Curated annotation (Swiss-Prot):
A GO biological process held by the record: mitochondrial translation
PANTHER family noted in UniProt: 50S/60S RIBOSOMAL PROTEIN L16, LARGE RIBOSOMAL SUBUNIT PROTEIN UL16M
Predominant subcellular localization, coarse grouping: plastid
InterPro entries: Ribosomal_uL16, Ribosomal_uL16_bact-type, Ribosomal_uL16_CS, Ribosomal_uL16_dom, Ribosomal_uL16_sf
A molecular function (GO) term: structural constituent of ribosome
GO cellular component terms listed in the entry, alphabetical order: chloroplast; mitochondrial large ribosomal subunit; plastid
Classification via CDD domains: Ribosomal_L16_L10e
Self-association and partners: Part of the 50S ribosomal subunit.
Keywords: Chloroplast, Plastid, Ribonucleoprotein, Ribosomal protein
UniProt protein name: Large ribosomal subunit protein uL16c
Superkingdom as given in the UniProt entry: Eukaryota
Similarity annotation: Belongs to the universal ribosomal protein uL16 family.
Annotated NCBIfam families: rplP_bact
């Protein structure tokens, strides 16, 4: 599963997702892509599940690029713990995704295979997303 090798600080503020994605919103590597239409946090497990689903469907053909990386730690307090005594410990990692962000790219396969593989990956995501084709 994806996670940073090391970070400057162990814990982060939650922050807020406003506006749309101006970086990482166009196809750079492959011919087909999955683009997010809503803001959300996508966990490392969800990213990996989508990647595995695409790889399994495409078999050996084609190449897949994961365009998001989970670099934000999410902390969780133990259950039945009283309030106070600091912030919880980091439990898992998320990628902050804004509308317009490209999640996955795919190349080296036909459009029908790419569309099917990307739709399977899209069903693993917690948001609405759309299939994009590189216009040449």
């Amino acid at each position: 599963m994806l996670s940073p090798k090391r970070t400057r600080f162990r814990k982060q503020h939650r922050g807020r997702m406003k506006g749309k994605s101006y970086r990482g919103n166009c196809i750079c590597f492959g011919r087909y892509a999955l683009q997010a239409l809503e803001p959300t946090w996508i966990t490392a497990r969800q990213i990996e599940a989508g990647r595995r689903a695409m790889t399994r469907y495409a078999r050996r053909g084609g190449k897949i690029w994961v365009r998001i990386f989970p670099d934000k730690p999410v902390t969780i307090r133990p259950t039945e713990t009283r309030m106070g005594s600091g912030k919880g410990s980091p439990e898992y990692w998320v990628a902050v995704v804004k509308p317009g962000r490209i999640l996955y790219e795919m190349g080296g396969v036909s459009e029908t295979v790419a569309r099917a593989a990307i739709s399977i990956a899209a069903s693993k995501m917690p948001i609405r997303s759309q299939f994009l084709r590189l216009e040449i």
